[in-house]
Amino acid sequence: MANTKFRPLHDRVVVRRVESENKTAGGIIIPDTAQEKPQEGEVIAVGNGVLNDNGQRVSLEVKEGDRILFGKWSGTEVKINGEELLIMKESDIMGILA
């Protein structure tokens, strides 16, 4: 994403999904058509925050490089420079993985 000229606005973040395993614990390979999309990702770009009631900018808690969990239906899928990414609001993020 470093060579991309895209920067999300306000409280939005750009997320790259983390690929899930395509094999079960028993060794059965799951085809792409039967796999669920992962709900884990890496934040690759963040907006500059939102304005509070006093007009002060409140920055986001997540930052580039954070590994996050998000809801199954969170975000909007977009393609930027040929890469499938998600754009979502920070409130759609459930937590940061340590």
UniProtKB/Swiss-Prot annotation:
Pfam family, one: Cpn10
GO cellular component: cytoplasm
Compartmental location: Cytoplasm
Subunit (UniProt): Heptamer of 7 subunits arranged in a ring. Interacts with the chaperonin GroEL.
Protein role: Together with the chaperonin GroEL, plays an essential role in assisting protein folding. The GroEL-GroES system forms a nano-cage that allows encapsulation of the non-native substrate proteins and provides a physical environment optimized to promote and accelerate protein folding. GroES binds to the apical surface of the GroEL ring, thereby capping the opening of the GroEL channel.
Entry's family note: Belongs to the GroES chaperonin family.
UniProt protein name: Co-chaperonin GroES
Organism expressing this protein natively: Bartonella bacilliformis (strain ATCC 35685 / KC583 / Herrer 020/F12,63)
Phylogenetic classification of the source organism: Bacteria, Pseudomonadati, Pseudomonadota, Alphaproteobacteria, Hyphomicrobiales
GN (gene name): groES
